């Protein structure tokens, strides 16, 4: 297998879906086999490659075609102001991307906002949904035990409103459990993504003013999702409360939960080796 990098796997597709007319989506595409689509979270500067570069190689080596999507309004994809809840629009973007790429069915891996998109996809397009792997997904309403929004979400919106290296570092400091992993390379890479398209940040805030995070809630429909699902959570997540994982496994017909100790909101990055082993076993045998 040749070495994977962002530039050699990069491509664009143009989709036409409700709310996303003649819309360019950027993705990284590598490998052959069953399709695994990885969906990133919603923080400023997020993108498919930066979210999943520690995962794409092992998945390709295991025999999967791996697609890392830049969600609408993020990184290299077109910018957008959304008039509907973001998880639903993002799900449509995945469906449109699959249509262009000729993919009939895919497994979905979703972190935070990407998890909300994966849940919406499974509800809207069940026949095109393989297995689901969710890491601290959004879109699950209030918590019985934790005041919301949590600290990390407050800092995320502060970064959207006041983008600077200082506000970025404030958010990253609660993003990961092990702060020694917050390297200058991580900070500068994220900051470069933020600076690349400031319209993304403005439009995210405009979208959030139209439809707040509470509008993303798909909890009442969790029982409709029949796909086999692996839910993972960082025990020390300061963005989305751990009890939401219990809500998922209590209400979805075929869901299991794995909690990573000493782990924040980015399990697939902070505990990449363990995450890769767990999720690849689930795809093969779960």
UniProtKB/Swiss-Prot annotation:
EC number: 3.7.1.14
Entry's transmembrane regions: none
One GO term of the biological process aspect: biphenyl catabolic process
Organism superkingdom: Bacteria
Catalytic activity line of the entry: (2Z,4E)-2-hydroxy-6-oxonona-2,4-dienedioate + H2O = (2Z)-2-hydroxypenta-2,4-dienoate + succinate + H(+); (2Z,4E,7E)-2-hydroxy-6-oxonona-2,4,7-trienedioate + H2O = (2Z)-2-hydroxypenta-2,4-dienoate + fumarate + H(+)
Keyword Aminoacyl-tRNA synthetase included in the entry's annotation: no
Family matches, as InterPro entries: AB_hydrolase_1, AB_hydrolase_fold, AB_hydrolase_sf, HOPD_hydrolase_BphD
Residues covered by the AB hydrolase-1 domain: 36-271
Sorted UniProt keywords: Aromatic hydrocarbons catabolism, Hydrolase
One Gene Ontology cellular component annotation held by this UniProt entry: membrane
UniProt key word NAD: no
Site (Catalytic role in ketonization of the dienol substrate (substrate destabilization)): 190
Residues marked Transition state stabilizer (site): 112
UniProt pathway annotation: Aromatic compound metabolism; 3-phenylpropanoate degradation
One function term, GO molecular function aspect: 2-hydroxy-6-oxonona-2,4,7-trienedioate hydrolase activity
Active-site residues per Swiss-Prot or TrEMBL entry: 265
Stated role: Catalyzes the cleavage of the C5-C6 bond of 2-hydroxy-6-oxononadienedioate, and probably also 2-hydroxy-6-oxononatrienedioate, a dienol ring fission product of the bacterial meta-cleavage pathway for degradation of phenylpropionic acid.
The family this protein is said to belong to: Belongs to the AB hydrolase superfamily. BphD family.
Subunit structure: Homodimer.
Name recorded for this polypeptide: 2-hydroxy-6-oxononadienedioate/2-hydroxy-6-oxononatrienedioate hydrolase
Organism of origin: Comamonas testosteroni
The encoding gene: mhpC
């Amino acid at each position: 297998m040749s070495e994977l990098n962002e530039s050699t796997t990069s491509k664009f597709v143009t989709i036409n879906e409700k709310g996303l007319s003649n819309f360019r989506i950027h993705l990284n595409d590598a490998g052959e086999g069953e399709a695994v689509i990885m969906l990133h979270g919603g923080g400023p500067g997020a993108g498919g490659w930066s979210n999943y570069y520690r995962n794409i190689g092992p998945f390709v080596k295991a025999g999967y075609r791996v697609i890392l999507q830049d969600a609408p309004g993020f990184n290299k994809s077109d910018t957008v102001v959304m008039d509907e809840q973001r998880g639903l629009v993002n799900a449509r973007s995945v469906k449109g991307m699959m249509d262009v790429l000729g993919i009939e069915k895919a497994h979905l891996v979703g972190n935070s906002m990407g998890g909300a998109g994966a849940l919406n996809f499974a509800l809207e397009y069940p026949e095109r949904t393989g297995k689901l792997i969710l890491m601290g997904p959004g879109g699950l309403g209030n918590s019985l035990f934790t005041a919301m929004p949590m600290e990390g979400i407050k800092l995320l919106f502060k970064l959207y409103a006041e983008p600077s290296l200082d506000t970025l570092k404030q958010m990253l400091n609660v993003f990961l459990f092990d702060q020694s992993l917050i390297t200058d390379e991580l900070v500068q890479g994220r900051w470069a993504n933020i600076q690349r398209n400031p319209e993304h940040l403005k439009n995210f805030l405009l979208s959030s003013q139209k439809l707040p995070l509470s509008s993303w809630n798909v909890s009442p429909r969790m029982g409709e999702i029949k796909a086999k699902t692996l839910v993972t959570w960082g025990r020390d997540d300061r963005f989305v409360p751990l009890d939401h994982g219990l809500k998922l496994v209590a209400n979805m017909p075929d869901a299991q939960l794995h909690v990573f100790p000493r782990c924040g909101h980015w399990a697939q990055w902070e505990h990449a080796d363990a995450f890769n082993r767990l999720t690849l076993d689930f795809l093969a045998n779960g």
